[in-house]
């Protein structure tokens, strides 16, 4: 994927709602931050998302997150907000995909571990898949057993109930290329905690570095 191809691992802090928290995530040296444009406790407006993205652009990868949004709205956001990649929960519209490709944006398709199409989805049309639990953004942990029964042809990002304490173990268990966190680094919904963010990013990157040393 054009905007993410230079990364050997991927640590994303999702649900950023302010420039203050964007800077916090940048300072922690995460790979990416996520701006949620779907209905959520961490939702940002088009204008707010644009302001944060413009502030963070170049310092960190900026991912726009959508869940069952209308295709026209996704295209409007892509037109007005300087994103590096788009993460889609729900149906991936063909026209939207074509526009994202023309713009050179990375495309991440989110799959719930209990979705009917988890085993049937053709991931070759996207750049990465994000595997989450049945209720994204809830902070609830879930079983990763399904990932031992399903291989993907593209990089895999895991999410759901992650925090600084368990992230290394989840990476080890799943072999995931990337990790994604929201609730596990917050003091309140949409409010990031500096210490939790730093500890999470450090724990994830430390394990990825260890894997490289081992030749994983």
Listing of model-derived features with the role each one plays in the protein:
Residues 1-216:
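Conserved N-terminal beta1-alpha1 strand-loop-helix module at the mouth
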